[in-house]
Amino acid sequence: MLTTTFARKREESVPLRKGIQRALLGLSCLVLSTTSFAAGGEWRTHGYDDAGTRYSPLAQITPDNAKELGLVWSYDLESSRGVEATPIVVDGVMYVTAPWSVVHALDVRSGKRLWTYDPEVPREKGKNACCDVVNRGVAVHEGKVFVGSLDGRLVAIDARTGKRVWERNTLIDDDKPYTITGAPRVIKGKVVIGNGGAEFGVRGYITAYDPTAASRPGVVPGPGDPSLPFEDASMEAAAKTWDPAGQVLGSGRRRHGVELDGLYRKAGFCCTSAPATPSPWSHRKRSPAGGDNLYTASIVALRPDTGEYVWHYQQTPADNWDYTSTQDLILADIELGGKPRKVILHAPKNGFFFVIDRTDGKFISAQNFVPVNWATGYDENGRPIENPEGAWPGHLSMRFPAPSARTNWHSMSYSPQTGLAYFPAQNIPLVLQEDKNWSYNQAQPGQAMAGIGWNLGMLVNPRPPASQPFGRLIAWDPVQQKEVWRKEHVSPWNGGTLVTAGNVVFQGTADARLLAFDARDGKELWSAPMGTGVIAAPVTYEVDGKQYVSIAVGWGGVYGNFTRASERRTPGTVYTFALGGKAEMPAFTEYQLNNLVSGVDYNPDDVAEGTGLYVTNCVFCHGVPGVDKGGGIPNLGYSTAETIAHLDQFVFKGPFMPRGMPDFTGKLTPEQVEKIKAFILGTADAVRPKK
């Protein structure tokens, strides 16, 4: 049994076990098997190769001929929510996932459907997904396709027939709001999967399974027994970085999210981009006496056979701002100081680009790639030099970057030819302030999304942000730690990147385009319209001697749920291009443009209380009425008068529950719904242009 957990005396163990283990939940642990190394003509694993570079050796498409790219085929994913999947291409078949963890198998030559598999995720589980009902893809191994379902199952599907071979519930507690949105990885004969849910206060871990029989070799960390000693030294060391006084909050414990995204490369261990979000976000709330709170916001290396801890590097000690480390890790061999070094390249949400020695986890360098104000840099020991003006409690904090900003989950690529990393960067403005009234799972008006289980310990935007949003593509030199070129986009929330040996970088954008750039200087080479905004990354592969580029498109994700940069809202689609492609683009559909809601009576005295209720239950899905435009989910300020007049019919066992809308029966009263209506209508009146 593969277990790396912490167990110690009961009076100390329970909070830490459920806290630090949770830290491993947000763990972006991308684990890749050397046996699944992608042949040049295929895209067999999530990051293309066992180093996660998203660099293809295909070179048929070049800066000179990229303008000749044309559509070859498109495929309708029959979905209306966010599409974050990286397609996998093996033996002439593309496997791609849609929202709600639905798997599609396509003939890569024609784009025709071979089969689909729907794990039939109960739609009430949608409320447990902080950031949309997305899925980032599958793993393919020895005739099976593996997918993690949103409700926490790992499913093995026959790659030829699309029939389920086996499934396993990966959750250690079915009563907790866990989700899986990440792609599984296959490493050394094991299927490995992580999970998410940090905002909801769930405990993180990674599980490994035998792909042939669905047996589970182990859990990291394992559930453990609080009456026993710590199970290894790493958990005992982590326990010392948490304040026991802050570990039990109300009826709950400190929580941390994890999502699988580590890398294995003949080094004997898996490098795990680890624990994402500590919960609550407020460090003072979860650990009043301080402490670094290992292993949150860290890169952790584990033995792939046993899950044994090897080393860690914490990028944001005592994380106060949701600076997850779940972004892509890339393994590279570069020359530093005249010597070859085996390194990890990483650009997480805290706004710094890191170069870490992957053999021992030692810090090499870090440099901010966008403006930051939470820290002025990193010292020689790899600790951030923090800005004391951000100290809590009470301060309004206009943090740069904000929690959704600088980078997010969107994929990075690295070219050994140019020596550059290519990644989307952004600013999504946010103001945070410690919430003095916060208690675990005790939702109060004004606490963002606490009504559906979020535990932030922070007030979100107690006053409007001052900075402006932006989105850009950055080409970064990890040796010199400097930007080489950038491309400004019209909005944040752009897709991940692909780079090829032909010196071409591909990226999709929030304003519904697929772009090609010269990898050397950033010159735009080609553009194709997409049916809606793009958040996923493209892939490339070769069929019958011809290079193709494919991308799965569908607007959504947490930011894309409530706003948009394109007026197109075509259902989720896979688009495939090649030189000389002559197929016609499918017809695009557009958002229906409605006027601000009016003509419904409300009591202006209810607006203030309705504001807090709306923030607590609605804001991160529907946005601010009449201010945000609406994205994957409609903005209620542009609803019809009939909809708002009968809002209770949508809130209580409403018609959109089959699409994932929560049922607020027993959580809101009819009187509270009236006050939410007043806020929607009052805000619409406030922003309506004066005649």
UniProtKB/Swiss-Prot annotation:
Residues noted as binding pyrroloquinoline quinone in the record, renumbered to the chain: 84, 136, 181, 197-198, 349, 408-409, 558
Induction field: By butane and 1-butanol.
Annotated compartments: Periplasm
Superkingdom classification of source: Bacteria
One CC-aspect GO term: periplasmic space
Temperature note: Optimum temperature is 60 degrees Celsius.
Record-listed Ca(2+) binding positions: 199, 322
Consequence of gene loss (knockout): Cells lacking this gene show a delayed growth on butane and are unable to tolerate high level of 1-butanol. When both bdh and boh genes are inactivated, growth on butane and 1-butanol is eliminated.
Functional pH dependence: Optimum pH is 8.
Activity control: Dehydrogenase activity is increased by ammonium ions.
Entry annotation: catalytic residues: 322
Pfam families membership: Cytochrome_CBB3, PQQ
Top class in the EC scheme: oxidoreductase
Molecular function GO terms recorded: calcium ion binding; electron transfer activity; heme binding; oxidoreductase activity, acting on CH-OH group of donors
Binding site for heme c: 618, 621-622, 661
Self-association state and partner proteins as the record states: Monomer.
Family assignment from sequence similarity: Belongs to the bacterial PQQ dehydrogenase family.
UniProt-listed NCBIfam families: PQQ_enz_alc_DH
Name of the protein described by the UniProt record: 1-butanol dehydrogenase (cytochrome c)
Lineage: Bacteria, Pseudomonadati, Pseudomonadota, Betaproteobacteria, Rhodocyclales
